[in-house]
């Protein structure tokens, strides 16, 4: 779109000089006619003959026609582009798609250590996070399944055993008899003693077999 105004500006500068182009060979012609007596048999300069100047006028005419054609084509193109810009509605620029880069982090990487140290400073181990839906019972909750895609390593064997011991002690305590049952006055059935070699048998009567 910027070529049209530049071409028009250049043509405006050349238009005052166009009428002077045919006058350039006139001084040479004047010098040829200054001799006065120039017969065809004599060796006259070729610039003095009008028959040798026809190709110069033809070249100048061709140049003028080319300039006029270029100016006309530039003006037509500029007008067409301007009309198309006015006819098209102003649409918002299209959004360019965003590229998402996924960076894998290893547990030994400095980025992972920085993130874990920042989280440990912000939330210490002894501090409980505020939950909007109340406190959670840690004994009733099942441990989350370990995923291979998590950046943190799985817990060691000792930690897993320590985590499983409180859950095993809970059901064992619930199965113990309550001390209130003995104080309620219930009678316990005597356990029969087993017969052994040291146990004394009752004396037999004389009529018994």
Swiss-Prot record:
Species the sequence originates in: Homo sapiens
Name of the featured protein: Transmembrane protein 52
CC annotations in GO: membrane
Alphabetized UniProt keyword annotations: Membrane, Signal, Transmembrane, Transmembrane helix
Location in the cell: Membrane
Signal sequence interval, chain numbering: 1-32
Source organism phylogeny: Eukaryota, Metazoa, Chordata, Craniata, Vertebrata
Pfam assignment, any one: TMEM52
Domain of life: Eukaryota
